[in-house]
């Protein structure tokens, strides 16, 4: 029995995150992005028009934290939100052309960082690992 057989899942995921997070952060830094900003760009590329509150729920962060991320991306010209909407509606966020290009570049550097971390596994192990993570993380 290996050490992993006896370790709690949260501990193992924390350790994987501790290896992956600095790799991804270093890859995103030259693009002027943080990991939360990349997550926001990725969510908006997959689901345009989400509000700040919806993005916060999907990212499991506070609405205040997501609003900070959105404001920075807006200031960078990557995200656009209307100045106002009809009564009772939240502001939908969308990627600008610059945001779509940035999201595409960010996706590429994040995948390269992923590949460096996953290099310890065979290709079939990588696919299975990602499949299992997707299953555990689905709603």
Curated annotation (Swiss-Prot):
Modulation of this protein's activity: Binding of effector molecule SA, or its structural analog PAS, to the binding pocket of Rv2887 induces conformational change in its DNA binding domain, preventing binding to the promoter region of htm, triggering the expression of this SAM-dependent methyltransferase.
Signal peptide residues on this chain, from the entry's feature table: none
SUPFAM superfamilies registered for this protein in UniProt: Winged helix' DNA-binding domain
Residue sites binding salicylate per the record: 42, 114
Keywords: DNA-binding, Repressor, Transcription, Transcription regulation
Domain HTH marR-type stretches: 6-138
Gene3D superfamilies reported in the protein's UniProt record: Winged helix-like DNA-binding domain superfamily/Winged helix DNA-binding domain (1.10.10.10)
InterPro entries, per the entry: HTH_MarR-typ (IPR000835), MarR/SlyA-like (IPR039422), Tscrpt_reg_MarR-type_CS (IPR023187), WH-like_DNA-bd_sf (IPR036388), WH_DNA-bd_sf (IPR036390)
Disulfide bonds: none
Knockout consequences: Mutation of the gene leads to derepression and increased expression of htm. Inactivation of the gene confers resistance to the imidazo[1,2-a]pyridine-4-carbonitrile-based agent MP-III-71, an effective antimycobacterial compound that shows no cross-resistance to existing antituberculosis drugs.
GO molecular function, one term: DNA-binding transcription factor activity
Domain notes: Conformational changes take place in the N-terminal and the winged-HTH (wHTH) domain on ligand or DNA binding. SA and PAS stabilize a conformation of Rv2887 incompatible with DNA binding. Rotation of the N-terminal plays a key role in the dimerization.
Subunit structure: Homodimer.
Name of the protein this chain belongs to: HTH-type transcriptional repressor Rv2887
Organism the protein comes from: Mycobacterium tuberculosis (strain ATCC 25618 / H37Rv)
């Amino acid at each position: 029995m290996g050490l992993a057989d006896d370790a709690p899942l949260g501990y193992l995921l924390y350790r994987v995150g501790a290896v992956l997070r600095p790799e991804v952060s270093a890859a995103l830094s030259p693009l002027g992005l943080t990991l939360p900003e990349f997550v926001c760009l990725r969510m908006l590329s997959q689901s345009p028009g989400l509000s700040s509150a919806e993005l916060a729920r999907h990212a499991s962060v506070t609405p205040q934290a997501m609003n900070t991320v959105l404001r920075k991306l807006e200031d960078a010209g990557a995200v656009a939100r209307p100045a106002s909407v009809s009564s009772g509606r939240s502001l939908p966020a969308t990627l600008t052309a610059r945001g779509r290009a940035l999201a595409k570049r960010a996706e590429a550097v994040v995948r390269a960082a992923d590949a460096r971390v996953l290099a310890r596994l065979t290709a079939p192990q990588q696919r299975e690992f990602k499949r299992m993570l997707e299953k555990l993380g689905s709603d």
